[in-house]
């Protein structure tokens, strides 16, 4: 079983690349953003709670995120592997994911970070916001707040996964096909 964590700042292309990777490697794609949106749309208790944080551009607390994610993994227990998109975002979440996967005799195989310049990403999100209807992609101040949160809370994950020899950085600038090729080269060499 292969379990890959795909991370990068909002707008780095995680969702786009995850679609290609899940097909190519037959993985179950677990996007925390999609899971949040589903729970918010359906007004679940966890969804209502998550929305209060997302509306401010803040990260959703670990306990809420972890409960949502564990539920999705349990629904897909016969999967050949998982592609975690947007999770973990903090060291506490990484430890919780390791503990949860260990309880199922699994582990994170690799983490791959899509890296790109903030200014390029801001423009990507503002363009996406024009057609996606996603409110959090239409406000530059909220976007920059999300990047600040990422730098403070998510960036330390690089050291955590580097220390475990599971971290790979991939250039997230280029065509979709170029980036997919770079990601595939990393995965094929695991």
From Swiss-Prot:
It catalyses: AMP + ATP = 2 ADP. ATP binds at residues 11-16, 128, 174. This is Adenylate kinase. Residues 31-60 are annotated as: NMP. GO terms for molecular function: adenylate kinase activity; ATP binding. InterPro entries: Adenylat/UMP-CMP_kin, Adenylat_kinase_CS, P-loop_NTPase. Pfam families: ADK (PF00406). Residues 127-137 are annotated as: LID. It comes from Flavobacterium psychrophilum (strain ATCC 49511 / DSM 21280 / CIP 103535 / JIP02/86). Keywords: ATP-binding, Cytoplasm, Kinase, Nucleotide biosynthesis, Nucleotide-binding, Transferase.
